[in-house]
Amino acid sequence: MYLNYNSNDTFVSTGGKNIELNKPTICFVHGAGQNHFSFTQQIRYFANRGYNVLSPDFPGHGFSKGIPNSSIEEDAKWLLGVLEKIGIKKFVLGGHSQGCLTALELSQLKPEVLKGIIFIAGASKIPVNDFLIGKASEDPYKAYDLMVTWGH
């Protein structure tokens, strides 16, 4: 589904199901340079077993428009805002890679909304290729394209 958040079209995968606020909710958060496709199988599985499943594409990722957020804190605040706009009050949050850091940050900002956290392949430090760091300084969009290319 698409919704307008912060004046941008924001895509949130729901597994093709309508959101029913009385159902339990799981939200999956992708890592840097990724999108909701990281969770295709999980989204389908839980959506077809009575859960609301949400997996938003962060700004500038996947089908969402806008400039990518510049920090983990911005990602967490953005995610909270999107879920609040949809009407989700409590949820389980699953993060992959950088999404784990977003989930951890969200747990510090607003712990009362979480029923649980799932960390998938997270790390406290992620080594980054020196060439990519240089490209990010010169041309952030080229660096993003390289991450997507190298990731597939």
Q: Model regions: which residues?
A:
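Active-site loop/oxyanion-hole signature of alpha/beta-hydrolase fold enzymes
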Residues: 3-13, 40-48, 52-94
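Active-site glycine-rich loops that stabilize anionic/oxyanionic intermediates
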Residues: 31-34, 97
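Short beta-strand-to-loop junctions in surface cap/lid or active-site-entrance loops
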Residues: 10-22
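Helix-rich cap/lid subdomain of alpha/beta-hydrolase
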Residues: 118-152
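Alpha/beta-hydrolase active-site loop signature
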Residues: 33, 58-62, 124
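Conserved hydrolase catalytic core segment
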Residues: 89-127
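Short beta-strand element of the alpha/beta-hydrolase
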Residues: 22-31
